[in-house]
């Protein structure tokens, strides 16, 4: 089978907290070992078991803001008093080498990432089947206190209001189905004509 070289896909998955974006993104990474993960920069403290450079790049707020000011971050935001951002260099290097990447970020990150990489981003928004189900899922998280859940529910409504900015939308009422749908989005993105290098030369050779 002929495989032409192509530019990588930047798959962005966004959703309100509890809708399943991280679970879906992790399932894609587990099923496709070649799928690259962007290691974000954050100003929050490491949680037990988290490793620098594997889960996050942990930086203080001054360094984080310097990176943002110097253009070293493709996108960044301060959420709940914590800074999160995507380093520019490793992403651009991976895409140019033909490696696909998946990001689980919020709508603001998606907007900034699309502005920075307009030809590379393919985006997917994950909706919960209902707000009641979303609240139930958040309540199952033992680490979140009632005040935190209330704050996340308020933030969820804001996140959901931006669903129409995304290329694709799925409803996560069944996780296996949602993962399969996300994989279909990635497969279609890989086949985009604009992403396949040397395709023009290959087709031109048919008439020789």
Curated annotation (Swiss-Prot):
It is an enzyme of class 2 (transferase). Residues 8-187 form the Guanylate kinase-like domain. GO terms for cellular component: cytosol. The keyword Transport does not apply. ATP binds at residues 15-22. PROSITE patterns: GUANYLATE_KINASE_1 (PS00856), GUANYLATE_KINASE_2 (PS50052). The keyword Cytoplasm applies. Its main location: cytoplasm. CDD domains: GMPK. GO terms for molecular function: ATP binding; guanylate kinase activity. SMART domains: GuKc (SM00072). It is found in: Cytoplasm. Gene3D superfamilies: Guanylate Kinase phosphate binding domain, P-loop containing nucleotide triphosphate hydrolases. SUPFAM superfamilies: P-loop containing nucleoside triphosphate hydrolases. InterPro entries: GK/Ca_channel_bsu, Guanylate_kin-like_dom, Guanylate_kinase, Guanylate_kinase_CS, P-loop_NTPase. Keywords: ATP-binding, Cytoplasm, Kinase, Nucleotide-binding, Transferase. Its EC number is 2.7.4.8. It catalyses: GMP + ATP = GDP + ADP. Essential for recycling GMP and indirectly, cGMP. Belongs to the guanylate kinase family. This is Guanylate kinase. It comes from Gluconobacter oxydans (strain 621H) (Gluconobacter suboxydans). The lineage of its organism: Bacteria, Pseudomonadati, Pseudomonadota, Alphaproteobacteria, Acetobacterales. The gene is gmk.
